[in-house]
Regions:
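Catalytic toxin/effector domains delivered as secreted proteins or via bacterial secretion systems
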Residues: 3-144
């Protein structure tokens, strides 16, 4: 049984340029920009502040062999949830973000528009549950 990522996503963003064929760093920068990175690409741990929410944006190429299983997806995204959970404060040359600047945390997961298996969907659901236990919101965005 398969389902389209668009059916489980919270939103869809079209950026074109075959973003999913790019290398991971180039793809990450393009997706960061498209999803509203307002802290710069080198800011530690988080990518944007959005109305009091500290947001980390992560892209995951679900067509990669590593992410064929629920365990593969869960293990990768669990590390991202843990990193966001551990985030308290960070600074660069332009700004300092501390707990007074945010009241919630969110991991925004960017995925390609494709069919995924029930196994892959289970991996995403497992991550949502794990994040919920830590008080972190998960949103899934289809980027095409």
């Amino acid at each position: 049984v398969t389902t389209r990522t668009a059916k489980i996503a919270d939103r869809t963003v079209s950026i074109g340029g075959d973003v999913w064929k790019k290398g991971s760093f180039k793809r990450g920068d393009m997706i960061d920009d498209a999803l509203g990175n307002n802290l710069g690409h080198s800011f530690p741990k988080i990518d944007k502040l959005d109305n009091g929410v500290a947001v980390s944006i992560k892209s995951i190429k679900l067509s990669d062999k590593t992410y064929e299983t629920a365990k593969g997806i869960y293990n990768k995204l669990r590390r991202d949830v843990d990193a966001l959970d551990e985030f308290k404060e960070a600074a660069d040359k332009k700004r300092n973000i501390s707990p007074k600047d945010y009241s919630a945390k969110k991991l925004e997961i960017a995925v390609q528009d494709m069919k995924i298996t029930a196994e892959q969907q289970r991996g995403l659901e497992m991550v949502k549950e794990y994040a919920k236990e830590k008080g972190i919101e998960i949103s899934i965005t289809v980027v095409k």
